């Protein structure tokens, strides 16, 4: 399983997304309504779930690597869920006071939008893996 995980993560450059699927029962979905128009979802670890980290790359609109971010997810199930879903929930906290809830994905690009003062959300749309 570890070898498969390594191959899946190493063979493709992953961009990040946000989705309403929280992956294999280890997370609970939370719905967030933004500007009374759009509904977004993020996922949070259930109490007692161990958080683990993984580094993934963000792509720009030209499908080029923009930067790397460290995603924190709940156990191994989060990453394996990404490869079948293809979404999996993750929490990223770059500032220490604004948690950011993402889902990593394969074969998708991302767009960024501001949800509220607590976190930034990133949503996926169909695209190619960036080089």
Curated annotation (Swiss-Prot):
Entry keyword annotation includes Ubl conjugation: no
Signal sequence bounds: 1-19
UniProt modification remark: Contains 4 disulfide bonds.
Expression sites (tissue/organ): Expressed by the venom duct.
Cellular component terms per the entry's GO annotation: extracellular region
Protein's UniProt name: Conotoxin Cal8.2
Organism phylogeny: Eukaryota, Metazoa, Spiralia, Lophotrochozoa, Mollusca
Location relative to the cell: Secreted
UniProt keywords, alphabetically: Disulfide bond, Ion channel impairing toxin, Neurotoxin, Secreted, Signal, Toxin
Keyword tRNA-binding: no
Molecular-function GO terms, alphabetical: ion channel regulator activity; toxin activity
Entry remark concerning the domains of this protein: The cysteine framework is C-C-C-C-C-C-C-C-C.
Taxonomic superkingdom: Eukaryota
Function: Probable neurotoxin with unknown target. Possibly targets ion channels.
Propeptide stretches in the record: 20-38
